[in-house]
Design a protein with these regions (language model features):
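Well-ordered alpha-helical scaffold segments within catalytic/enzyme domains
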Residues: 23-40, 94-112, 160-170
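Aromatic-lined, polymer-binding surfaces characteristic
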Residues: 1-28, 69-80, 89-100, 107-110
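Alpha-helical scaffold segments in soluble metabolic enzymes
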Residues: 54, 102-105, 175
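Active-site acid/base region of carbohydrate-active enzymes
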Residues: 1, 32-91, 114, 118-121, ...
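C-terminal extensions
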Residues: 15-17, 95-105, 125-133, 148, ...
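Aromatic (Trp/Tyr) and acidic
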Residues: 86, 93, 151-182
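Conserved small/polar residues in nucleotide/adenosyl-binding loops
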Residues: 198-203
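Short acidic-hydrophobic sequence patches enriched in Asp/Glu that either
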Residues: 20-23, 40, 44-47, 122, ...
Length: 203
């Protein structure tokens, strides 16, 4: 199915591939780690690199972070975002980090030092920006950035950076996880809420 998404539009990507966020490079590498199908992995490299470059061209802000509408980010409507708002969100920036790390690892696997370094530097840059700009030091949480200011709301998407092991292993960031089990935080009878249940800073 991934060949259809990337090559099903007269040899090019399907139209929606250019609108909705994804961590496909990370996923394709993850599949290789399971099935060992190197031929499939290498066959996808040019497609994955082209997709990465496209996101850089269309969704990178002047500060180096990436923006996305909440609907196109798989969140439908959210407190922090908007369908047509170009806000830097923890989600897409984590995806771009994960994809850059994956492409760098593919470069290492194939002996392509230039590719490995290119995407390794991109990943390092995104990591620094996410930790410096999306971390709200008052709320102790990764939050969406509206222009030059935080959206000032803690949402479940603030945990996405950990899916890609982006944050430094530090109590500075680990403190965010105490909200998961807090019934006044994200904990609810049927799973996590999409946003925090209270608005004041954590005690």
């Amino acid at each position: 199915i991934i060949h259809t998404w990337y090559r099903g539009n007269e040899g090019g990507p399907m139209a929606k591939m250019t609108k909705f966020s994804s961590w496909n490079a990370d996923a394709v590498l993850g599949r290789y780690m399971v099935d060992g199908n190197k031929e499939f992995l290498l066959d996808m490299v040019k497609d994955l690199e082209a997709e990465y470059a496209r996101w850089e061209k269309t969704n990178r802000l002047s500060n180096g972070l990436y923006w996305q509408g909440d609907v196109q980010d798989g969140m439908e409507e959210s407190i922090s975002g908007g369908r047509r708002k170009q806000y830097a969100r923890p989600t897409i920036n984590s995806y771009m980090y994960g994809n850059a790390k994956a492409l760098s690892l593919i470069g290492i696997m194939t002996g392509d030092e230039g590719m490995a370094m290119k995407y390794g530097l991109k990943a390092d840059s995104i990591k620094t920006l996410v930790q410096d700009k999306l971390w709200n030091t008052d709320h102790h949480f990764f939050e969406t950035m509206r222009g030059d200011a935080s959206a000032e709301v803690r949402e479940a998407i603030g945990y996405i950076p950990w899916y890609f092991n982006l944050p430094d292993a530090s109590s500075q960031y680990d403190v965010a996880w105490k909200e998961v089990m807090d019934e006044k935080g994200f904990s609810a009878p049927y799973g996590l809420t999409t946003c925090l249940l209270y608005t004041s800073p954590s005690p």
